[in-house]
Every structure is written in C-alpha cells, then in structure tokens.
Amino acid sequence: MFKQPSVSLALIFFGIVTLGAISGLGLAQEHSLSHQEQKMIEWVDKHQDKILAELKSHVEINTGTDNVAGLNQYRDLLSTELATLGFATKTHSSEDIDVLSCKGGQLQIADHLVATLSGSAANKVLINGHMDTVFSMDDEFQTLKIEDDGVLKGPGVADMKGGIVIMINALSALHVQGLLDDVNLTVLFNSDEEIGSLGSRQLIEELAKQHDIGLVFEGTYNNLATRARKGLGQARLRVIGRESHSGGAHENGVSASLEMAHKVIEVEKLTDYQSDVTVNTGVLSGGEKRNTVPGCADAYIDMRFPSLEAGQKLEQSIKEIASKVVVENPKYPNLPLVESWTVLHRPVKAENAKVDEIIAEAMALSALIGEPIIGTRYSGGGTDGSITQAVGLPTMDSLGMDGKGAHSSREESTVQSLIARTKLAAVMLARQLHK
C-alpha cells in the first residue's frame, strides 16, 4: 500500500507571472517524500544510462505524421514496453483525412495505442502523449546528439519523445515498488497530434469522460507549468483557375496564384494582437511551371484564439474571404473557383481549480527533487490536454522535457531535465494513482 506523506499547504501567490496576471494559485511550501518515493528516485538515478539510451532509440525512429510505417514501429515498441509493466494494450484505428489541396487525396493516419491497468483504486487517471513529430522521413534532422555539457539535440526530444520516455520510466519506477498494483490507469498514445488530432479526437474525448484526472507529458520551456492555453484552428483554401501559355496565350489563362495572393493578404489581416488572435498562412503553393499561367493554388492556414467566439468569428471570416472572387476573365466567367475547409481542432484550455492544485503540488515537489518549476504561463501552443479538459477532465499538461526550438532543427533539451522530470513524474503518478 502506498502511503501519502503528510503535506502542509500554505497558500501564497506566485512571485513569477508569465504572459498575464495570475492570482489565487497556491504553492505548497512544505513537502516530504515517503520511503517508497525515495526508492523511486534512487531507481531513476541508478538507471540514468538506460533512460538516456532509451531516449536515443525513441528519437531515432522517424515518426513524422505521414510516416505510417515508422509510427507502427514505434507503437509496437511502446506496446511491448507497457505490456512488460502489466498493461493490457489495444490499437485503435482512425479514418483517413481528406486533404483539400491541388494534389488532393487523403492523409493516412497510423493506429493509436491504448494501454490499461484496471484495478479497484478510486482515482481513475488518464495519461497521454503523441507518437508523431513534425519531421518527415526525408528531413535531415533524424538523430540524437548528446553534447559534453549534457545538451540533447534531436527530432522530438522535447516534443515529445522525451515526455514519452519520462512517462515510461516513471511507470517502471512505480512498477518496481509495486505501486502499479490494483490501480486504475489508462495510457493513450495517438499518432496525429501534430496535425490537430483530427483522427483521434473522438477516442481522446471518450477516454477523458471515463477518468477523474488527466496528465499530459508535452514539453515546456524555462521550467514553467502551463496553466491555460489558446484555442487552435486550421483552414485550407484551394483555388482552381485555368492554365495557359504565359507568352503565347496569356489572355486565355486564369491565374489561381493571383487569386490566392489576394486571399492570403485578406487572411493575414485577421491577426489582431490586441484581441490575442493570430492567423498564419504557413504553407502556400501555386502553379508548376514558370511559363504557365497557374491553374491551381492552395494554402494551409493556422489560427489561434482566446475564446470559442473568437475562433468561430475567424472561421466565418475565412469563409467570407473565400466567397469573394477578385480575379476576372470574361472568357471564363465561372473561374476562378475557390474552395475552403476549416476546423477548430483544439478548444481553449481555461484555468481550472483542480489543475491549479496539481500544479502547486508539482512546483513544490520539483523544488524538492531538482530542476524546480518556477512559475506558470499562458500558452499559444496546443496539446490534447485541451481536448480532455473541454469534456470535463481536469488536465495538467507540460509535464515533459524542459526544452526549446521545437518543430525546428534547433530542438533541444538536457539530460538534467530528462532525469529530474522522470523523478517528478514518478512521485506525481504515485500520488494521483493512490488518492
């Protein structure tokens, strides 16, 4: 039986405030570790080389969202690791995603992994992470580099292979102490988080409704815990024009790229920093040859917003922009044709009293264990924790690696963060599972 150590809580306001005023969140000033918790920390210290080697093996399996084979390989590895700890594992499939673009077609989604321990413990805990990264198979950034000063550089080291390795090894530390016996715990690894969890959202919501608390092992930066997040949306535009020789028959063409240029200018005007709304045309393509009037153009757009109403307003604005054609050619009155697709894929993650309690405990424990969490932040980035909390599951995210440079070849973290966060995760999981 796991015994909770006595805790004396004295509520104080945070001295560090990041990206907005924070009030009413208490910090546990006094904490002590139980004998079992100390033994878990010792286990992590003893297995540092093993944990680092596992991180390298995880990072060097390419799991770009479109690399189904790589994701299948990684899922099988995770399934084996969890089965060794006594979990029952099951895969869940998603329908392919239709892509509105000049090339068209569908994006195949790799199967997701759900692992469960079904005991009689009262508190039902859901922990989750995503297997996919933004790095494709042909990206040059494919390996983990361990530098002499302990800096780790590699694809997904912070987002979020590091978080997964932390999670697995924290569970291993609990397993050695017998602290996974008779618990109610579900682990979810999805394969499409980097494209908005479009295929896995229903599964995430269903599982969230069956649990009492959620923990997400996404990374963070500057040792800050994420208290609230913006909502996220995405949109696609496709313009169909008419190809023609740009020299001999320019007048017979209808430029899809010209029409799209007008669209992008209007879309970018939707950014309003004062309202905390941003819009970014992240991917833009048009035409195939220099000497041909482009017959097709497409754009892939990102939206960030502070409220559901603001997100819905963005959706409507993009649809209105798509409905107004600017380029004209009297010979072809039905062209250009503009199509749009929008989705609000991440709800706003608001402050939550239960989550604040978990953050306060995490801050106190981290100060005791090492690499303390020094404050909180409001983030414009998204996680699946936004989805779980939107359906009623209090969810703390940002329990993974402290790092920087995510989604770029500069992505990095540290060995210190890997080990310290594994210790913190082990203690926090033990306490949540045995409440």
Roles of regions detected by a PLM:
Residues M1-I12:
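Bacterial N-terminal signal peptides that target proteins for export
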Residues M160-Q234, D272, L433-H434:
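Acidic/histidine-rich catalytic neighborhood of metal-dependent amide-processing enzymes
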Residues E30-L152, V176, G385:
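Acidic/His- and Gly-rich active-site-bordering loop/insert found
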Residues D132-D148, A228-R238, A364, M401:
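Acidic-glycine-rich active-site phosphate/pyrophosphate-binding loop
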Residues D149-D159, I373-T376, S408-S409:
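Short pre-catalytic strand/loop immediately N-terminal to key active-site residues, enriched for Gly-Thr
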Residues A10-A21:
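Bacterial N-terminal signal peptides
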Residues G24-A28:
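Sec/Tat signal peptide C-region and signal peptidase I cleavage site
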Residues Q29-K39, T63, E81-T84, R236-K435:
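Metal-dependent amide/peptide-bond hydrolase catalytic core
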